[in-house]
Amino acid sequence: MDIFDLKICFYFTVLLSLNIFSQTKTDGWEEGSRYNKLFSNKIDTLSGVVIKVSHSTPMQGMAEGIELEVQSGKDTVTVQLCPKWMAEYLSLNIQPKDEVVIEGCKAVCKGTHIFMASKLTANTIILQLRDDKGIPIWDRLR
């Protein structure tokens, strides 16, 4: 391997490291972010049927996240689960028509009423997304 090849390998490694760091460390979903400051310890429970699963960016500058539209009685509720990369890491497979029970809190984000999930029960899975203090579990994976 000559010096030119070593330089290319070095630059590629640095760029890859910066890209991974930028996607996970400061994606707007972390504890202390503007978004997570919306989370309240006043936990409610929501149950219903998933109408739609989509990707959304809750606030400007955030990484994409997973969002559900859940029919709960006569209401349709927007539920924000977690960053997209976390759902991919967990191989999360939530589909329309799935029955769900979600614990979390109500919040207003960009003028829209949302439900920020802390625990999801669907099909045969129970997924804890935040601890008792509202700290996202994905912060432990960074």
Q: What positions do the PLM features span?
A:
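N-terminal signal peptide c-region/cleavage motif recognized by signal peptidases
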Residues: S17-N19
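Short boundary/loop segments of OB/S1/cold-shock single-stranded nucleic-acid-binding domains
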Residues: T24-T45
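Bacterial N-terminal signal peptides that target proteins for export
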Residues: M1-F10
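N-terminal post-signal-peptidase region of extra-cytosolic proteins
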Residues: I51-H55, V79-L90
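OB-fold/S1-family single-stranded nucleic acid-binding modules
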Residues: A107-P136
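Structural detector for short beta-strands of small beta-barrel domains
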Residues: K42-M62
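OB-fold (S1/OB) nucleic-acid-binding surfaces
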Residues: M59-L81
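Short nucleic-acid-contacting surface segments enriched for D/E, G, S/T with interspersed K/R
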Residues: M86-I102
